[in-house]
């Protein structure tokens, strides 16, 4: 008898948990806010062919935001929002050393400068966004270290794009 009630109890518990979460206002993060704020976004990119720029355009397209690349000498439309993104800066510095006085751990910092404007008003004044990670260097596996740095840098770019999208969704932009 108890074996038959156990699956029902699990189902009831799961259902109650879902109802409680939706009742308190919890919902998965979505890009609806972004697409409702910006139908079209003009992008002024320092390097339109960089990996960061491609990830940003792909993410904005996934959020149903139409993007137009703005050439550096072109006159922007007055009623459209312009997102200016500078070149990504990648800095690498040693954090710790091993007994042989060689760097054992490094910190990688990836940063970009952004600004958002519409007409004469600045929605987001020029600011720097950054992400940092650390990794251990294996002296015996230099090739593996390079691969690890490339993987970490790609993850950091994705995180920086997500950070930028969340910044664009900020409630301060609703005015």
Regions found by a protein language model. Give the residues of each.
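Bacterial N-terminal signal peptides that target proteins for export
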Residues: 2-13
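C-terminal motif of bacterial Sec signal peptides marking the signal peptidase cleavage site
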Residues: 20-23
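Bacterial signal peptide processing site
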Residues: 25-28
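Acidic/histidine-rich, surface-exposed loop or edge segments in extracytoplasmic proteins
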Residues: 36-44, 141-146
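N-terminal segment of the mature soluble domain
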Residues: 39-89
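Sec/Tat-exported extracytoplasmic proteins
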Residues: 45, 60-67, 89, 116-120, ...
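Surface-exposed short loop/turn segments
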Residues: 81-128, 134-147
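C-terminal/domain-edge helix-coil "capping" segments
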Residues: 143-175
């Amino acid at each position: 008898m108890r074996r038959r009630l156990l699956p029902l109890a699990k189902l009831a518990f799961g259902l109650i948990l879902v109802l409680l979460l939706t009742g308190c206002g919890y919902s998965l993060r979505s890009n609806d806010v972004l697409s409702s704020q910006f139908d079209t976004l003009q992008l002024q990119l320092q390097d339109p062919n960089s990996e960061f720029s491609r990830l940003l355009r792909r993410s904005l397209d996934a959020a149903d935001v139409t993007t137009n690349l703005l050439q550096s000498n072109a006159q922007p439309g007055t009623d459209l929002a312009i997102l200016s993104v500078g070149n990504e800066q990648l800095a690498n510095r040693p954090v710790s050393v091993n007994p042989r006085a060689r760097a054992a751990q490094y910190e990688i910092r990836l940063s970009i400068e952004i600004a958002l404007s519409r007409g004469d008003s600045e929605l987001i004044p020029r600011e720097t966004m950054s992400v940092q990670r650390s990794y251990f260097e294996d002296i015996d596996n230099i090739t593996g270290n390079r691969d690890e740095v490339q993987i970490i840098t790609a993850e950091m770019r994705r995180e920086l794009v997500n950070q930028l999208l969340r910044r664009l969704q900020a409630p301060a932009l609703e005015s």
